[in-house]
Amino acid sequence: MVIVANKTLIRKGEGHKLVKRFDKIGKIEMQKGFLGLEVLVNAKEKEVDEVTISTRWETKADFHAWTKSEAFREAHSGRNARPDYILGNEIEFYDVEVVRMPIAQAQ
């Protein structure tokens, strides 16, 4: 499993706008190898808002296939193009080495 973290810097007070863009079903949910998505908001006091979109994929190749797909282009063009409140972003890739799940307690 691979995690792709897209850390985005946003004008102070406008982070909620990016969060809202991801608070709906999109085309990514139908992509081969897609395992899930989380939207993370950094609560530290800063001069900018920081929102990280974390996606989980079976393989890095699955993520790259998504970025080359027509669905990706549609999601990132036209009225869905990069809003002016986004100041910049950085994408990081993480290989998942250990996963631990909760153990159900006996009743």
From Swiss-Prot:
Its main location: cytoplasm. It catalyses: heme b + 3 reduced [NADPH--hemoprotein reductase] + 3 O2 = biliverdin IXalpha + CO + Fe(2+) + 3 oxidized [NADPH--hemoprotein reductase] + 3 H2O + H(+). InterPro entries: ABM_dom, Dimeric_a/b-barrel, Heme-degrading_MO, IsdG. PROSITE patterns: ABM (PS51725). Residues 2-93 form the ABM domain. GO terms for cellular component: cytoplasm. Fe cation binds at N6. The keyword Iron applies. Heme binds at H76. Coiled coil: none annotated. Belongs to the antibiotic biosynthesis monooxygenase family. Heme-degrading monooxygenase IsdG subfamily. Homodimer. This is Heme-degrading monooxygenase. The lineage of its organism: Bacteria, Bacillati, Bacillota, Bacilli, Bacillales.
